[in-house]
Amino acid sequence: MEKKGLQIDWRRGLIPLSLLAMFILYFGFDAPLWVLAVFTLWIPIYYVVYPMYLRKRWTAFEKQFAYRFQKEDYKGLLELYRNQWFLRRFGPQAEMLGKLGLIYSAMGKYREAEHTFESALDRAHETQEDKLFFNLANVKYELGKYEDASQIYRSLKVNSPYRHSARTQLALIDLRQGERVDEAREFLEKARKRASAPIKERIDRALAEC
């Protein structure tokens, strides 16, 4: 998904702007040194204390998320997510939205998940896109948007860790659409043996229905 507009990290200019402000305060308004000293306190707070606090909150959230997701406590996860105001506002937005998309997907709220993953991709770094695109394609598959899902699966990088799973999904799409049915069935029957429980269930359902 192509990013729109110029992407600027405004935080890089904070220190130069602060130095300019200090220059103006000292030479323009004859501010005492103690005022300048207080003014500079934000630098260690913003660049040291704030990242440490953010990392602590994020680590705790990730552990709680993994634990509850494994327990299939999706309603509890949604409540946990909504209570994370600090992380939703100041944390890694693409990762936060990606986790919300996973919650919606697990709850069967695929339209909400689709919108959430698309929003996450708008904010994602290049290194995060593969996982988000794969999850988005899975949601589109569940919504019956097979052409969109197929296009995303095929666009994944050759060295993507999701490449094999994407091949399984493409075989499912072929089966659903009645294309290369024998080849798709053969591939899915082999893939089923080493598939995770959710994928195995998806394969079984497709084989039974098609």
Give the label of every model feature segment.
Residues 71, 107, 143, 177-178:
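Structural motif corresponding to the intra-repeat A-B loop/turn of tetratricopeptide repeats
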Residues 89-93, 125-131, 160-169, 193-205:
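Boundary/linker segments of alpha-helical solenoid repeat arrays
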Residues 74, 110, 146, 180-181:
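TPR-repeat structural position
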Residues 77, 113, 149, 183-184:
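Single-residue signature of alpha-solenoid repeat helices
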